[in-house]
Amino acid sequence: MDKIVTEIILPTLPQIQKLFDDGKIGKSEQQLMTGIIANSILMITHHSSKSESGKNVIILSADSESLLISEAAASAFRSQNWNVFSIGDMSSAIDVLFDLELRKLLSKIWKSKEGIMIILIFSQSEEGLKFFSDSFYSVKENSENNMFIVLSGKTGKKVKIKADLSAPKLEDILQWSNTKYENI
């Protein structure tokens, strides 16, 4: 199932945007195609198998433009038996109290600290990646060694952003995550 996400769904998203930007489709057609993709992701999610208790991932989008990509990633992780906590577009949560909210969330969903916890952040802006990376690292410093931060999106050389992995391709993120889990 993850091949459907990585080889069909994800490559389709920029093509739809390109068709819209080039004026070949209108806003309603763009919305229709995006809706079809969202429904496809939901169908894949509902056909996923049971998750393994030690494989945990929190997936979020730092902006609305990355929401479908984060949902596709959640579907791909579920198809590989990960326990997925997809929290969607968190751009409205960018404030000074976010790290406190994150600690509270982690204490509820990863009580036993069993296995591995990967926090996967998608963003089309460096600012979004930097904010969430900084917040997660403030929490990570006081937590277990089996928590990892993964970034996917636009990163440049101007801004220093901390991450255990920064990768544009979901296939690379999935492979790295599974390898990390196998090595704990």
Give each language-model segment a name.
Residues 1-4, 26, 92, 101, ...:
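General structural signal for secondary-structure boundaries
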Residues 1-48:
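Long amphipathic alpha-helical segments
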Residues 23, 81, 88, 151-153:
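Glycine-centered flexibility sites
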Residues 35, 39-138:
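Conserved mid-sequence domains
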Residues 82, 146-147:
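A structural micro-motif
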Residues 139-144:
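Short, conserved loop/helix-junction motifs that constitute active-site signature segments
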Residues 147-184:
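Peripheral docking tails and interdomain loops at the edges
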